Design a protein with these regions (language model features):
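Short aromatic-glycine-(Arg/Gly/Cys) micro-motifs in beta-strand/loop hairpins
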Residues: 1-12, 45
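A short, exposed loop/beta-hairpin motif centered on an aromatic-Gly-Thr core
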Residues: 10-21
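Short, mixed-charge low-complexity intrinsically disordered segments
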Residues: 30-66
Length: 66
């Protein structure tokens, strides 16, 4: 069985997804967009700006077989 997990800034999210589309929808609902600087379409990026501080999160969807 194949499941999909999200790794964000080096940490795995606690939840796993049964479809790639569900994992993508979860990231998009949290403000992530596809990172077009990467050749892999499963790389996502989110930039948060607050006052003078800009913070960037990087996420990747990984496939795991059970």
């Amino acid at each position: 069985m194949e499941i999909f997990v999200i790794s964000c800034d080096g940490y795995l999210w606690e939840r796993a997804y049964t479809s790639l589309n569900d994992a993508k929808k979860e990231l998009q609902s949290r403000g992530f967009v596809i990172d077009f600087n990467s050749l892999d379409t499963n790389h996502y990026i989110r930039t948060i700006k607050y006052k003078d501080i800009t913070y960037t999160n990087y996420a990747k969807i990984k496939s795991v077989y059970l």
